[in-house]
Design a protein with these regions (language model features):
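Pair of pore-lining "gating" transmembrane helices in MFS-fold secondary transporters
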Residues: 2-47
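Juxtamembrane helix-start elements in MFS-like secondary transporters
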Residues: 38-51, 100, 132, 136
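Central cavity-lining transmembrane alpha-helices of secondary-active solute carriers
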Residues: 44-66
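Cytoplasmic membrane-interface "Motif A"-like loop-to-helix N-cap segments
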Residues: 66-80
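C-terminal ends and interior cores of transmembrane alpha-helices
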Residues: 79-96
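Hydrophobic core of transmembrane alpha-helices in multi-pass small-molecule transporters
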Residues: 97-116
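Intracellular juxtamembrane helix-capping segments at the cytosolic ends
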Residues: 112-127
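Glycine-rich segments within core transmembrane alpha-helices of 12-TM secondary carriers
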Residues: 127-144
């Protein structure tokens, strides 16, 4: 590995990607546990719903990026964090399978938007770099 690989800028993107992966995967695991406590036979189905919602959020980022100005984008991402936190708290204390799945879908759709933003920003930085796979692999490993 060359000294370019260990640059301060690359390290910043590795940390950003790792944090996102850690938060996303940890929340997904916790969601599965919450659903498992309420309705164990439906964990896999509920997980497929939230992962589908995160894909929709991932795709929705393109619309946000294209049609919303820069200041509003930062405001939206900040609002998403607050909403996700509130939804998570509501979901944690709910005993209704339907409510948990609906709040989980909304929360993971917002995660999808945020994940798309994180990966987009990282890919813009890494576009002309030869070590993209190593960077993303390292970030994913750190996130787990």
């Amino acid at each position: 590995m060359n000294k370019d690989f260990f640059s301060k800028e690359r390290f910043k993107y590795i940390i950003i990607l790792a944090l996102f992966n850690y938060i996303f995967l940890g929340t997904e695991y916790l969601f599965d546990n919450i659903v498992g406590d309420i309705k164990p036979q439906s964990v896999v189905t509920a997980q497929s719903y939230i992962l589908g919602a995160s894909v929709l959020g991932f795709l929705f980022f393109a619309i946000i990026k294209k049609y919303i100005n820069k200041k509003l984008k930062y405001g939206l991402l900040s609002a998403f964090i607050v909403v996700e936190t509130l939804l998570f708290a509501l979901m944690e204390y709910s005993e209704s399978y339907g409510f948990v799945v609906i709040t989980g879908c909304v929360m993971f759709a917002l995660f999808g938007v945020m994940g798309s933003a994180v990966y987009y920003i990282s890919s813009v930085y890494l576009k002309s770099n030869r070590n993209v796979a190593s960077t993303i692999g390292l970030a994913y490993g750190l996130g787990i």
